[in-house]
Amino acid sequence: MGIQLLPLHRMEERHIGLTQAIADCFYEAACVCLDRHHAPPQEFDLHGDSFKQKTLVEWKSTDDRSKKAWANKDDATRDGAYAFALAATELCLGLCAVSRAETLTGADYYIGLRDKSTDDLENCFRLEVSGTDLDTYEVNRRLRGKVKQALKGKSNLPAIAAVVGFRVKLITMQKVYDES
């Protein structure tokens, strides 16, 4: 089997926790982040607790208007990382966005199985996300920080931390376990 495509396009059709406007916004931010360092398409490494694989990332190069709209690098990186992390959890774990998480939960999104009822978050995971344009060391440092943040969250749901390294073409994910 060939390299699987990272499912960044039309995410609202699979992630009920995203509207079309939000999915489009996250995708556009991701394109701006990718264009800082690369030309399409590119292969990214995807690392998780029990897997290491490559994924193909395809995107449309952004124009000057999009780059100016996303001139705040922090906002673009955060929102682009949301797109990548949600697409990666879908591809590797079969989990999709169910809802945005509340403040202080130690997460950005709740993710769950696509074909399960989402009225109750009991069967969901929390997803804590970060993105960076720096090196692999920084990706790993941020992952450790996101794990700690998820552990401190005011929620008893299990969590997954994810960090996207746009420059180094790396997506890392780690399940978070409460050791108490």
Predicted regions and their residues:
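A recognition module on extended beta-rich or small alphabeta surfaces enriched in W/G with H and D/E
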Residues: 2-12, 16, 20-24, 130-179
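A generic structural motif
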Residues: 112-114, 164
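A short, highly charged nucleic-acid-interacting micro-segment common to nuclease
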Residues: 66-81
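Nuclease-adjacent, charged terminal/linker segments that flank catalytic cores
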Residues: 1-60, 64-70, 174-180
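Short beta-strand or tight-loop elements
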Residues: 105-107
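Conserved catalytic cores of phosphodiester-cleaving nucleases, focusing on short active-site segments
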Residues: 84-93, 109-111, 120-134
